[in-house]
Amino acid sequence: MQVNETLSEGLKHEFQISIPAAEIDAKVNERLAGMKDKVRLNGFRPGKVPVAHLKKVYGKSVAAETLEETIRETNQKIFTDRGFRLANEAKVTMPTDQAEIEGILDGKKDLTYSVAIEVVPPITLADFKTFKVEKLVADVTDAEVDDAIKRIADQNRPYAPKSEGAKAENGDRVTLAFKGTIDGEAFEGGSGENIPLVLGSNSFIPGFEDQLTGIGVGETRVIKVPFPKNYGAAHLAGKDAEFETTATLIEAPQDATIDDEFAKTLGVESLDKLKEAMRERLTQEYAGATRQKLKRELLDRLDETHKFDPPESLVNDEFDLMWKSIHAEMESAGKTFADEDTTEDEAKTEYRKIADRRVRLGLVLSEIGDKNKITVTDDEVSRAVIERARQMPGREKEVWDYYRSNPGAVAQLRAPIFEDKVVDFILELAEVSEKKVSREELFKEEDDKAAA
């Protein structure tokens, strides 16, 4: 066997490999000999079929299987001998001339093929004992518990009919009957009866609610609005519509009394119990924010201390996924790059930097996990599946079946578990100081930070 490296540029390598026909033919004959006792052919006693006859019957298919196995084993030896860790699947280029292929399968021609790879660079890990990170912690105050309960009360506040002759104002709930038309023709889904709408909630298409301010009970108005260009129903998107709209009831929001009775409407036995439950929920929420801030700071330190050029193919794959998602989000929101005060080229440059960071950090975390034997157990994955199932009441079996039949989905569950375990490993070694902060500081967004 001859191996010639035809390309070595950075992390990219290409090899041309030549395997003698005699070597392949010997492997084919060995495999055929192993079939003698298993194959049953008319005219031959069990185990007495000559290899030459087996070769006539099964030679081509066995040769194809042998070639596939030989190429796989040869490539693996080449990569292992050179200490290569592949960034992605090797690209094998086989002969295309049919006569040459036939000759190889018949054991008369040497097999010559090429393989192109991109490898993961050697990664020198930092000394994590030198890392210093700050853990931001916020206590849940009584006022924050009360504010959270008040927000729930505001969302569930009762409404009462306004006095006769009163007009609708922002915040009022108006019950409507309407008929919609486009170019004078009614359209599916354009009519409704007894439809409640809180003015200012922006729950109808833009411009609809504004034209209802000041309407009275029994009053009819023709509301003229265009459907958004990114509207979900494509046959309506961007079209001008008219809605003949009548207000049948106008109600004003009432102050909710926050007491034991209010707590019971939420399924809690008393206001004190509601406060306990809210404090627990906020405590978990704050702990989650603390964890995210700490993790972000740690990833930033890993980014600063591990500078290397990651495999271009991995960065391209990550960028393509991100770019596709960005375009889908912008299209859904009906926005352009100009709306975000940037250009497409500037956005591409920025997101390619983020893709580079994500790939590098992923490789660093993987290296840390490998060197310190950090793994994700089946029990940990099962717990993650159970948690997903709990989030979808009534569909638990569907969730279990989905993960049982989708290895890719299971891998997506493993990835964040592995990442968190590696982060915990580093935090055990790093110097972590704790700082008390307010809720506002804990949840403050850091827009200048790159997405991790």
Swiss-Prot record:
GO terms for biological process: 'de novo' cotranslational protein folding; cell division; chaperone-mediated protein folding; protein transport; protein unfolding. It comes from the Bacteria. InterPro entries: PPIase_dom_sf (IPR046357), PPIase_FKBP_dom (IPR001179), Trig_fac (IPR005215), Trigger_fac_C (IPR008880), Trigger_fac_C_sf (IPR037041), Trigger_fac_ribosome-bd_bac (IPR008881), Trigger_fac_ribosome-bd_sf (IPR036611), Trigger_fact/SurA_dom_sf (IPR027304). It is an enzyme of class 5 (isomerase). Its EC number is 5.2.1.8. Residues 171-256 form the PPIase FKBP-type domain. Signal peptide: none annotated. It catalyses: [protein]-peptidylproline (omega=180) = [protein]-peptidylproline (omega=0). Consists of 3 domains; the N-terminus binds the ribosome, the middle domain has PPIase activity, while the C-terminus has intrinsic chaperone activity on its own. Involved in protein export. Acts as a chaperone by maintaining the newly synthesized protein in an open conformation. Functions as a peptidyl-prolyl cis-trans isomerase. This is Trigger factor. It comes from Afipia carboxidovorans (strain ATCC 49405 / DSM 1227 / KCTC 32145 / OM5) (Oligotropha carboxidovorans). The gene is tig.
